[in-house]
Amino acid sequence: MSPRAIAASIAAVAWLACALAFAAPPIPQSLAAQEWTAIRKVIDDQREALKAGDGAKAMTYAAPGIREQFGTPDNFMRMVREGYGALLTARRTQFLEGAVIEDAVVQPLRLVLADDTVLVALYQMQKQPNGQWRIAGCLIAPSTVQST
């Protein structure tokens, strides 16, 4: 990513961290490789459930606050279709390097759409008391990187 793209991503992550108020245990400033693998699996599994139209399963990958906010699988799927359609329709995806910024764990996912538009989905992750990672929020931002 270019320095400008990194700065834009950091600004978006800062906005996301401020916008999402949740109680979570402190996170170390770096995570082990197996933690990033677990995080990416949660994101992949939720996207598969979303693409299959399985709102109930997709909600299981969301943090408790997100599940409470949307209440039902139908409401959750409606929100995804209306605001996060790129997650469902991207023709290609690529995980970028994740980051821990203060207590926010952020996993970027590059999305390439059918028209070669490139977006970045910034997932904020939350580790649950049982040790599992859940999605606490997602912000989709334009990318300055072109499709290859």
Describe the predicted segments one by one.
Residues 26-28, 33, 83, 97, ...:
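Acidic, low-complexity intrinsically disordered segments
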Residues 30, 37-41, 45, 55-102:
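Short solvent-exposed beta->alpha transition segments
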